[in-house]
């Protein structure tokens, strides 16, 4: 099997090599036909090359390296742990690409556009090193527009080696963890694929949530309310004391149903509240919104966003639509602010302009640590390409994402929405019921960003000290366990914990899925038994690697390298000092996969044990010595030293799978109800209502 994969990989490399070779030769012929261009720009992707060449015309030749061209060796460690000298090699299959680039750039001025993150700077550094290019040859831009590109080529700069060093440190740390832990994993857990530095911390977060859900014991409580003038007023006080919904017992519920026949309105509070516009998108918030509103996986969002940034073929030519999509800054350039202001004034009026254009752009993200770079937010490159116009230029999914970005950006530059909030307190003996409702009096940014249903006006007829006939209602409910992570909520958690960076979120999730440590069911991320076993091993042998605090601290140190405050080699050596202790212990101490389970043996009624053998995880009965394969569709939780199998309680139809097309978050809500531990009771709700339909009547 491994040999087959190698052969397939070699064939793929050969095809990629031939494809790139043909492309570069074509570019060379094109150069000759134009009389030979003196300046060459090398970008990563053919799409970006096409867009930039259309902008710059005949003065520049723009060619593509088709991605990375140099990295640490695939089949060797490539790092001298004493000197930290790195043994880079041309990526297999890219040799002829490099040779062609060398020929085409010989004797010419070379410019290297760098994506505005560490990885982009490192790619430019690799290219400049291979080509022997020195001096000011780096150009940067956040959007592929005529203004931005022409401005960039006028102002080249030198390579930022602090950025490069931060990326080298990240690459070396990842290589150390992957190269040194993975063989130990393979020795103990045959099914395990590998262990990554940041992915392992993310796996632990997912496993901890599943364990938390397993340990959760539902608590029964009652919701008690009255319907009055289009409002739903809930019981909030008993004998003058605030009461939480979870503290409302069946006894209280029955007492309310029996005794409350009418209520008196004791207070109305009316106040004006402002709802501020959202900040423009950064990578993480775009991923979260695209998941919850469009149902896009993170990887799909980033793929489409990259294409919108680099440019897509339209009937009007190869056109870029958005700014750079890997960013953790909400900053908006002065040019973009001015364009948005003109658009808003023309289409909506002065009252829709943000009181301060800085408000939204100063919000930023809640990421622990620093924003990686003071770059721009994700926004449309031309606000005049409205979603309506873009619909004629883009396919369905590209248009959906563009519309999301366009609306978010325009909304961020608009004024606040203004609401009038009404709060009502109703009293009946020792019981107080509270209700509130908001009425929008000015839509502001919500004119483009959201559509709210108009509330009922009946509540305005209510008067203080008036008494109203009511028929209270009650419904039994249960507290629910914390939701499983979706891709969107995991990205939010990783961002808030300071784990990873915008460019890595999609890779982290995809790697866990590809390795079989996590599966996606109804848009929720569920750790597999293999994922739990791998996490258990890493927790026991390499606790720092899976510790989110430690991982976040490493990100801060990489930030300090980028800021020139720390030497990258010292950061790596400091990591190695502690890591080597765990590594030696893991090498020398015996570790066995031997978990008790709650799975019953069909032959002797004893309980199986979970073990690992030549072909991976299996079940073994210690009493009758029988073995049983562990099916891949079995899910469980390892808590302590025992595996508890989870059972599927609800059918797909009950989860609303029949005819609905759901977003990630709405799908996740049903998916989060799907697996429960064996001894947990069903979460069905019982209703107890005094009347199926009741209307508030003025007494």
Curated annotation (Swiss-Prot):
Q: What does this protein do?
A: Releases the supercoiling and torsional tension of DNA, which is introduced during the DNA replication and transcription, by transiently cleaving and rejoining one strand of the DNA duplex. Introduces a single-strand break via transesterification at a target site in duplex DNA. The scissile phosphodiester is attacked by the catalytic tyrosine of the enzyme, resulting in the formation of a DNA-(5'-phosphotyrosyl)-enzyme intermediate and the expulsion of a 3'-OH DNA strand. The free DNA strand then undergoes passage around the unbroken strand, thus removing DNA supercoils.
Provide the catalytic activity annotation. Answer: ATP-independent breakage of single-stranded DNA, followed by passage and rejoining
Keywords from UniProt, A to Z, are: DNA-binding, Isomerase, Magnesium, Metal-binding, Topoisomerase, Zinc, Zinc-finger
Compositional bias (Polar residues): 661-672
Catalytic residue positions? 324 (o-(5'-phospho-dna)-tyrosine intermediate)
Region span, Interaction with DNA: 194-199
Q: Where is the Toprim domain?
A: 38-146
Residue stretches of biased makeup (Low complexity): 684-699
Keyword Magnesium appears in the UniProt entry: yes
Q: Which domain of life is it from?
A: Bacteria
- Please cite one Gene Ontology biological process associated with this protein: DNA topological change
Names of required cofactors: Mg(2+)
Coiled-coil positions are none
Q: State the organism of origin.
A: Fervidobacterium islandicum
Per UniProt, the ranges with Basic residues bias are: 674-683
Class of this enzyme? isomerase
Which CDD domains does this entry report, sorted A to Z? TOP1Ac (cd00186), TOPRIM_TopoIA_TopoI (cd03363)
Q: What is its EC number?
A: 5.6.2.1
Name of the protein in its database record: DNA topoisomerase 1
InterPro entries linked to this entry: Topo_IA (IPR000380), Topo_IA_2 (IPR003601), Topo_IA_AS (IPR023406), Topo_IA_cen (IPR013497), Topo_IA_cen_sub1 (IPR013824), Topo_IA_cen_sub2 (IPR013825), Topo_IA_cen_sub3 (IPR013826), Topo_IA_core_domain (IPR023405)
Q: Where does each C4-type zinc finger lie?
A: 601-624
- List, for all copies, the residue spans of the domain called Topo IA-type catalytic: 160-583
User: Binding positions for Mg(2+)?
Assistant: 44, 115
Q: Where is this region: Disordered?
A: 1-37, 649-699
Query: What is the primary gene name for this protein?
Result: topA
User: Which residues are listed under the site Interaction with DNA?
Assistant: 68, 170-171, 174, 179, 186, 326, 515
Please state which protein family the record places this protein in: Belongs to the type IA topoisomerase family.
